[in-house]
């Protein structure tokens, strides 16, 4: 039996999520396997972040992707969870609006805000 076809809508307007509370922007530096990644966060720290199962089953995260990181309550400067991965279109929008800098994406200086 063929799979049910999904209806594809035209250009949908979706709000770009921004970090809230103690969440941070981060760039994936290295994939470690078993759902773990090293992420360089906007505060200059490199955190070992886990991809929760809810996100792991839906989104493929690669080295160089811009993500939102939620630091853990314990070991907040060393560990965290990846909450969201931005698409390239969303990254371009964040650059245009001044939320992040090109240097942050390429490994240089930190964010503007």
UniProtKB/Swiss-Prot annotation:
Annotated InterPro entries: NA-bd_OB-fold (IPR012340), RNA-binding_domain_S1_IF1 (IPR006196), TIF_eIF-1A (IPR001253), TIF_eIF-1A_CS (IPR018104)
CDD domains: S1_IF1A
Matches recorded under Pfam families: eIF-1a (PF01176)
Keywords noted in UniProt: Initiation factor, Protein biosynthesis
Origin: domain of life: Archaea
Domain S1-like: 12-87
SMART domains found in the cross-reference section: eIF1a
Molecular functions per Gene Ontology: RNA binding; translation initiation factor activity
Stored NCBIfam families: eIF-1A, PRK04012.1-3, PRK04012.1-5, PRK04012.2-2
Function in brief: Seems to be required for maximal rate of protein biosynthesis. Enhances ribosome dissociation into subunits and stabilizes the binding of the initiator Met-tRNA(I) to 40 S ribosomal subunits.
Similarity annotation: Belongs to the eIF-1A family.
Protein name: Translation initiation factor 1A
Gene: eIF1A
